[in-house]
């Protein structure tokens, strides 16, 4: 890229006078950005206990592993969702992760494994609900729609190696006709998302849930290009309502 530097000697004195003010403004701006960007540790602490690894076993496939190569079932992520309390835990994940599974395990931060079963599934929105007997702390749901440009973070089982934490912004809301699901209402984000992230949590800076990670746009294989999509919280609630209509009880 070509850069052209313009030098005007008549402005030298004015520039010298304005420089301290300019520097002060920059310092104020940078300190403000640091305050916003520094929410990461608090966001992580608020949500980490409510996000689990999901490891399905598919017929004819080995157990999930790094990168889910051919012949290995894809690893995924799950969100402990606040449904009926006191009877185990309900875990939200992407339907495409568990739809073919003959066995499902969820793994917590300590590495403990728990047998899970599909309690309800909605292929049209790519939402599934698992149930485990173990009680985990549910995630807190956000109120209202996320604002475009607001800071968000993703807690996901990237490449099947464990829960990781990435942050970005809300790039857009209300995305539909993207081509992943029959019924779509996505929150778009540039927070890094990779294979294994499906079913992961997209949260606000306060750790409250705004969506479930579902898909990415990319030109090459499964490489993150910063155009990533999460099923919106209203769409998740629609999916749960549809399951209830079909007789699923929570």
What are the language-model segments listed below?
Residues 3-22:
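Bacterial N-terminal signal peptides that target proteins for export
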Residues 59-60, 82-164, 246-249:
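Conserved active-site neighborhood of the chymotrypsin/trypsin-like protease fold
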């Amino acid at each position: 890229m070509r850069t052209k530097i313009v030098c005007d000697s008549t402005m030298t004195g004015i520039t010298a006078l304005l420089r301290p003010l300019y520097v002060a403004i920059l310092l104020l701006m940078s300190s403000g950005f640091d305050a916003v960007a520094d929410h990461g540790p608090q966001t992580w602490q608020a949500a980490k206990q409510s996000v689990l690894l999901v490891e399905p076993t598919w017929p004819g496939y080995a157990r999930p592993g790094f990168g889910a190569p051919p012949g290995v079932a894809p690893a995924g992520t799950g969100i402990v969702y606040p449904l009926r309390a006191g009877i185990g835990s309900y875990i939200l994940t992407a339907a495409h992760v568990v739809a073919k599974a003959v066995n499902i395990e969820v793994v917590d931060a300590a590495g403990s494994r728990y047998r899970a079963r599909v309690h309800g599934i909605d292929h049209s929105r790519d939402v599934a609900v698992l149930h485990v007997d173990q009680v985990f702390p549910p995630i807190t749901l956000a109120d209202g729609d996320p604002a475009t440009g607001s800071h968000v973070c993703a807690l996901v089982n990237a490449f099947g190696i464990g829960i990781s934490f990435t942050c970005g912004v809300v790039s857009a809301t209300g995305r539909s006709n993207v081509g992943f699901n029959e019924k779509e209402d996505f929150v778009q984000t540039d927070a890094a998302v990779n294979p294994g992230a499906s079913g992961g949590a997209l949260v606000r800076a306060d750790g409250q849930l705004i969506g479930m990670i579902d898909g990415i746009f990319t030109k090459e294989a499964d490489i993150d290009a910063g155009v990533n999509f999460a099923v919106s919280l209203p769409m998740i609630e629609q999916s749960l309502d549809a399951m209830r209509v079909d007789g699923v009880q929570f």
